[in-house]
Design a protein with these regions (language model features):
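Copper-binding active sites and cupredoxin-like electron-transfer domains
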Residues: 1-305
Length: 305
């Protein structure tokens, strides 16, 4: 096997600038809220990525640090951006104290690449590297997470976003001036501690956008008149009614792909269920500082928005 691509690590919880594609087919990059997009290496026409599963420390709010598990130095891990039809190869190195896998949530791919440990692939032991390889078949917003000791590993923050851009102009995917993406995640961290309770299923006390809590969440910035797209994935254990102030949006995409325009309608709140992705779009035509948050009050206070 050729030498692995060097893993690119990230130490900051700030929102990184969008990654302009240095090679391969062009696309309009997204901005991952309080996150970043990982670079790739081109190898004989294949986009190669290297994810490292490892313990990390995430600054959830200024001065509030939490022991998590993630990828490439952060939780959530880096966003992966590709173009429809790209052949991709992802090297996954395990630096955790237990076995892991990665499931490419929502993707169409060969069964042996689906990442369910003990079903269609062996678990990746500590210190070992597994290689996933498949074609990005359809455009959309997807997620990745372990299917190995899920209760522990997802409670510790192991998750990330995957975005497949359309290869050509798509009749259901409009051009936008602002394109944001983030994951909903939740943790149970007792006062005076730094490590989440991994067996918690209901009583979470830290509700976050991309593992950041208000007021540490970066703003979604737009100029008046911009068309804005926001992609929201939910890997918590409960639904989240995501609500915008001062504007109406349309839900334009789901995990299954773009929604026909005849099936869209304006609203100000959309429920994002467990394991779902929702893509909303709106015109930023009202100037001001507007709230965007989960409308479950204890989540808003927790502080998810």
């Amino acid at each position: 096997m050729a030498a692995l691509p060097e893993p690119v690590m990230q130490g900051s919880a700030d929102t990184a600038a969008p990654l302009t594609p240095p090679n391969g087919r062009p696309y309009q990059p997204v901005v991952t809220l309080n996150g970043w997009t990982t670079p790739w290496r081109m190898n004989a026409g294949v986009k190669e990525f290297h994810l490292v599963a490892e313990p990390v420390v995430r600054e959830v709010a200024p001065g509030f640090f939490v022991n998590m598990w993630g990828y490439n130095g952060q939780s959530p891990g880096p966003t992966i951006e590709v173009v429809e039809g790209d052949k991709v190869r992802i090297f996954v190195t395990n630096r955790l104290p237990e076995s892991t896998t990665i499931h490419w949530h929502g993707q169409r791919l060969p069964n042996g690449m689906d990442g369910v440990g003990g079903l269609n692939q062996p678990h990746i032991p500590p210190g070992k590297t597994f290689v996933y390889e498949f074609e990005a078949r359809r455009p959309g917003t997807f997620m990745y997470h372990p299917h190995s000791d899920e209760m522990v590993q997802m409670a510790m923050g192991m998750m990330g976003l995957w975005i497949t851009h359309p290869k050509t102009a798509h009749p259901l995917i409009d051009k936008v001036q602002r394109d944001y993406a983030f994951l909903l995640s939740a943790y149970a961290v007792e006062p005076g501690t730094m490590t989440p309770r991994i067996n918690e299923m209901t009583d979470f006390n830290i509700w976050t956008f991309n593992s950041r809590a208000f007021p540490a969440i970066s703003p979604l910035v737009a100029r008046q008149g911009d068309k804005v797209r926001i992609r929201v994935g939910n890997l918590t254990m409960t639904n989240h009614p995501i609500h915008i102030h001062g504007h109406e949006f349309e839900v334009t995409g789901t995990d299954g792909g773009p929604i026909p325009k005849s099936a869209r309608w304006p609203e100000v709140t959309t429920d994002v269920a467990v394991g779902q992705m929702r893509q909303v779009e709106f015109m930023a035509d009202e100037p001001g500082d507007w709230a965007f948050h989960c409308h479950k009050s204890h989540h808003t206070m927790g502080a998810m928005g």
